[in-house]
From Swiss-Prot:
GO cellular component: plasma membrane; side of membrane; sperm midpiece
Disulfide bond sites: none
Tissue expression from the record: Epididymis. Highest levels are found in the distal corpus and cauda. Little or no expression in the caput and proximal cauda regions.
Function statement: May play a role in carrying and orienting carbohydrate, as well as having a more specific role.
InterPro entries: CAMPATH-1
Name of the molecule in the record: CAMPATH-1 antigen
Pfam families named among the record's database cross-references: CD52
Amino acid sequence: MKGFLFLLLTISLLVMIQIQTGVLGNSTTPRMTTKKVKSATPALSSLGGGSVLLFLANTLIQLFYLS
């Protein structure tokens, strides 16, 4: 059981890192626009998905550990 939880944590961390670096993100579309970006929100949008994934994986691991 502990091996499965470690594997789940490792996979979720790898996926989170790949989402943050843009490997699994939406990086295939060209980013050339004529509009100016007024805030840094689009640059931080991929970080939110990765941290949500890490939070859910951590919650699952804690629930399995407590049961």
